[in-house]
Amino acid sequence: MKRPQADFVRRLADIAWAHSGDKGDMVNLGVVVHDEADYALLLREVTEQRVLEHFKDICRGEVRRYELPNLHAINLVLTQILDGGPMRSLRLDPQGKTLGDSLLIMALEDQSDPASKSTPGR
Protein backbone atom coordinates (compact mmCIF):
# COMPACT_ATOMS: atom_id res chain seq x y z
CA MET A 1 0.00 0.00 0.00
CA LYS A 2 1.43 3.34 -1.01
CA ARG A 3 1.43 6.19 1.50
CA PRO A 4 -0.15 9.49 0.46
CA GLN A 5 2.54 11.98 -0.57
CA ALA A 6 1.37 14.51 2.03
CA ASP A 7 2.12 12.05 4.85
CA PHE A 8 5.67 11.33 3.72
CA VAL A 9 8.58 13.70 4.24
CA ARG A 10 12.03 12.23 3.80
CA ARG A 11 14.59 13.87 6.07
CA LEU A 12 18.35 13.68 6.38
CA ALA A 13 17.89 11.53 9.51
CA ASP A 14 16.36 8.84 7.28
CA ILE A 15 19.72 8.27 5.57
CA ALA A 16 22.39 9.50 8.00
CA TRP A 17 23.51 10.25 11.54
CA ALA A 18 25.43 13.30 12.71
CA HIS A 19 27.82 14.36 15.45
CA SER A 20 28.73 17.92 16.33
CA GLY A 21 31.17 19.84 18.46
CA ASP A 22 32.65 23.29 18.89
CA LYS A 23 35.97 24.75 17.84
CA GLY A 24 35.81 28.22 19.36
CA ASP A 25 33.17 30.17 17.44
CA MET A 26 32.93 27.39 14.84
CA VAL A 27 31.08 24.09 14.78
CA ASN A 28 32.08 20.84 13.10
CA LEU A 29 29.21 18.68 11.93
CA GLY A 30 30.14 15.17 10.86
CA VAL A 31 27.45 13.47 8.78
CA VAL A 32 27.72 9.75 7.94
CA VAL A 33 25.24 7.79 5.82
CA HIS A 34 23.77 4.57 7.19
CA ASP A 35 24.12 2.86 3.79
CA GLU A 36 26.97 3.63 1.39
CA ALA A 37 24.42 3.58 -1.47
CA ASP A 38 23.07 6.89 -0.10
CA TYR A 39 26.43 8.72 -0.22
CA ALA A 40 25.71 10.28 -3.64
CA LEU A 41 22.34 11.46 -2.32
CA LEU A 42 24.08 13.00 0.71
CA LEU A 43 26.45 14.91 -1.59
CA ARG A 44 23.57 16.17 -3.76
CA GLU A 45 21.36 17.21 -0.87
CA VAL A 46 23.71 18.57 1.78
CA THR A 47 25.37 21.45 -0.03
CA GLU A 48 27.05 24.42 1.60
CA GLN A 49 24.21 26.65 0.39
CA ARG A 50 21.44 24.42 1.79
CA VAL A 51 23.18 24.09 5.16
CA LEU A 52 23.67 27.87 5.37
CA GLU A 53 19.98 28.34 4.54
CA HIS A 54 19.02 25.76 7.19
CA PHE A 55 20.99 27.66 9.87
CA LYS A 56 20.34 31.17 8.51
CA ASP A 57 18.97 32.46 11.82
CA ILE A 58 22.10 31.62 13.81
CA CYS A 59 25.04 31.30 11.38
CA ARG A 60 26.68 34.66 10.67
CA GLY A 61 29.64 33.18 8.81
CA GLU A 62 30.08 30.58 6.11
CA VAL A 63 29.75 26.85 5.62
CA ARG A 64 32.58 24.72 4.24
CA ARG A 65 32.00 21.10 3.25
CA TYR A 66 34.73 18.47 3.18
CA GLU A 67 33.98 15.16 1.47
CA LEU A 68 35.21 11.92 3.03
CA PRO A 69 34.37 9.31 0.38
CA ASN A 70 36.18 6.40 2.06
CA LEU A 71 34.00 6.93 5.15
CA HIS A 72 30.82 7.74 3.17
CA ALA A 73 30.68 10.96 5.15
CA ILE A 74 31.08 14.71 5.01
CA ASN A 75 32.44 17.18 7.53
CA LEU A 76 30.79 20.59 7.65
CA VAL A 77 32.47 23.57 9.28
CA LEU A 78 30.17 26.47 10.17
CA THR A 79 31.86 29.71 11.21
CA GLN A 80 30.53 32.50 13.43
CA ILE A 81 27.70 30.35 14.77
CA LEU A 82 28.33 30.19 18.54
CA ASP A 83 28.17 33.89 19.46
CA GLY A 84 31.87 34.07 20.22
CA GLY A 85 32.35 30.52 21.50
CA PRO A 86 31.56 28.58 24.68
CA MET A 87 33.36 30.89 27.11
CA ARG A 88 31.67 34.05 25.80
CA SER A 89 28.25 32.89 24.66
CA LEU A 90 25.08 33.09 26.71
CA ARG A 91 23.39 30.58 24.42
CA LEU A 92 21.65 27.57 25.92
CA ASP A 93 23.94 25.30 23.86
CA PRO A 94 27.30 27.14 23.72
CA GLN A 95 29.17 24.08 22.36
CA GLY A 96 26.75 23.50 19.50
CA LYS A 97 26.06 19.89 20.50
CA THR A 98 22.43 20.07 19.35
CA LEU A 99 23.27 21.38 15.88
CA GLY A 100 23.88 17.89 14.49
CA ASP A 101 20.36 16.87 15.46
CA SER A 102 19.04 20.14 14.06
CA LEU A 103 20.67 19.40 10.71
CA LEU A 104 19.11 15.91 10.62
CA ILE A 105 15.59 17.38 10.46
CA MET A 106 16.41 19.03 7.13
CA ALA A 107 13.97 17.79 4.48
CA LEU A 108 15.54 16.17 1.46
CA GLU A 109 14.59 17.50 -1.96
CA ASP A 110 14.59 13.88 -3.20
CA GLN A 111 11.27 12.74 -1.76
CA SER A 112 11.21 9.32 -3.40
CA ASP A 113 10.04 6.67 -0.96
CA PRO A 114 13.05 4.50 -0.04
CA ALA A 115 10.67 1.58 0.63
CA SER A 116 9.87 1.52 -3.09
CA LYS A 117 13.54 0.92 -3.93
CA SER A 118 14.16 -2.74 -3.29
CA THR A 119 17.75 -3.84 -2.92
CA PRO A 120 18.62 -7.48 -3.68
CA GLY A 121 19.51 -9.39 -0.54
CA ARG A 122 17.55 -7.13 1.82
Residue ranges and their predicted role:
Residues 1-122:
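Long, contiguous binding/interaction regions
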